[in-house]
């Protein structure tokens, strides 16, 4: 089992956004989030808390045009940081799953730290993508975030909305269930010798 610190510091600077992100996979869930998109701050704070990942994000962007660029770019950087912090993935549990309710909403997430980016995202009710959940954060942004994280972290992720009416509840349950599943998958297991794959690499 690896004894190296599983931390990362990633920055991204484009004409659309400026992002500085630090994380510690073996943290306590502490966070300092400032993305200039308040609802996204709320979701990333929930992700950190429930995945026990210490997370600091400072970001600015062209949110006067749309929040899309900033939201997606932070997802990209978060995915890159997760990949970097995981290292060679030695000693991890690898798989995680979680079923999380938020009042009437219920979401299941399954995570495999596989090295093979793949997202299955389903079950959101009709009209969810167009709904303004908080400020200019629409339901469509939720999928964009998971796509960015999944691709850049090298994860296989299934997020399934099993029920819900309130868009805020649905989105928050998605982030929390993903966080809980990721927490299980990234955990170090002293019984795991080396990389948890019969191929010897992830």
Swiss-Prot record:
It catalyses: D-erythro-1-(imidazol-4-yl)glycerol 3-phosphate = 3-(imidazol-4-yl)-2-oxopropyl phosphate + H2O. GO terms for cellular component: cytoplasm. The keyword Cytoplasm applies. PROSITE patterns: IGP_DEHYDRATASE_1, IGP_DEHYDRATASE_2. Coiled coil: none annotated. Signal peptide: none annotated. Transmembrane segments: none annotated. It comes from the Bacteria. GO terms for molecular function: imidazoleglycerol-phosphate dehydratase activity. It is found in: Cytoplasm. Gene3D superfamilies: Imidazole glycerol phosphate dehydratase, domain 1. Belongs to the imidazoleglycerol-phosphate dehydratase family. This is Imidazoleglycerol-phosphate dehydratase. It comes from Clavibacter sepedonicus.
């Amino acid at each position: 089992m690896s004894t190296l610190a599983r931390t990362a510091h990633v920055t991204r600077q484009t004409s659309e956004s400026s992002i500085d992100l630090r994380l510690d996979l073996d943290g306590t869930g502490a966070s300092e989030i400032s993305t200039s998109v308040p609802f996204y701050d709320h979701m990333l704070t929930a992700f950190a808390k429930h995945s026990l990942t210490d997370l600091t994000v400072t970001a600015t962007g062209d949110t006067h045009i749309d929040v899309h660029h900033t939201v997606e770019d932070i997802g990209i950087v978060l995915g890159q940081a997760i990949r970097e912090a995981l290292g060679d993935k030695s000693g991890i549990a690898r798989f995680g799953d979680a079923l999380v309710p938020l009042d009437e909403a219920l979401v299941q997430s399954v995570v495999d730290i596989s090295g093979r980016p793949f997202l299955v995202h389903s079950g959101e009710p009709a009209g969810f993508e167009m709904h303004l959940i908080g400020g200019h954060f629409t339901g469509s942004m939720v999928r964009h975030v998971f796509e960015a994280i999944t691709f850049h972290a090298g994860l296989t992720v299934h997020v399934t909305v099993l029920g819900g009416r309130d868009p805020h509840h649905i989105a928050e349950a998605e982030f929390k269930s993903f966080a809980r599943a990721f927490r299980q998958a990234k955990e170090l297991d002293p019984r795991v010798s080396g990389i948890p794959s019969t191929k010897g690499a992830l």
